[in-house]
Amino acid sequence: MSQVILDLQLACEDNSGLPEESQFQTWLNAVIPQFQEESEVTIRVVDTAESHSLNLTYRGKDKPTNVLSFPFEVPPGMEMSLLGDLVICRQVVEKEAQEQGKPLEAHWAHMVVHGSLHLLGYDHIEDDEAEEMEALETEIMLALDYEDPYIAEKE
């Protein structure tokens, strides 16, 4: 299985307590090589101010969010392994994990899996797309030895 090249950018005021680079690498490797042979992904971990600004600029949402995915569009006629960028907001991930009663590490893993699937073209706007994407997320999370991230919604 091929490995994903990771460019990890830690842009928080306090980067202590974040997952290790090897964890981010493991989570990416659980998703992307299933769909694409060679790829490069940037993961940027940010504070709420940067997440809020990006979410407002690119999605028109006036609040920070857990993960933003920016797929790279390869110009016609070119071959590149750059898949895109994930921007993950530390504070939102930590708050959601606490509110949802999930282990923090599992929620970080889920955000990387979820964002990676977006980079690969998956979406959850339509119900059938959401079901397909959530099923893939669950399968990958279980393969990583985490619980189904949607278990509370299924009960």
Swiss-Prot record:
Keyword annotations of the record: Cytoplasm, Endonuclease, Hydrolase, Metal-binding, Nuclease, Ribosome biogenesis, rRNA processing, Zinc
EC code: 3.1.-.-
GO annotations of cellular component type: cytoplasm
Pfam families reported in the protein's UniProt record: YbeY (PF02130)
Enzyme class per UniProt: hydrolase
Disulfide bonds: none
InterPro entries from the UniProt entry: MetalPrtase_cat_dom_sf_prd, YbeY, YbeY_CS
Binding site for Zn(2+): 114, 118, 124
Localization of this protein: Cytoplasm
Cofactor(s) the record lists: Zn(2+)
GO biological process terms, semicolon-separated: rRNA processing
Leader sequence residues: none
Record text on cofactor binding: Binds 1 zinc ion.
Gene Ontology terms, MF aspect: metalloendopeptidase activity; RNA endonuclease activity; zinc ion binding
Family: Belongs to the endoribonuclease YbeY family.
Cited function: Single strand-specific metallo-endoribonuclease involved in late-stage 70S ribosome quality control and in maturation of the 3' terminus of the 16S rRNA.
Name used for this protein in its record: Endoribonuclease YbeY
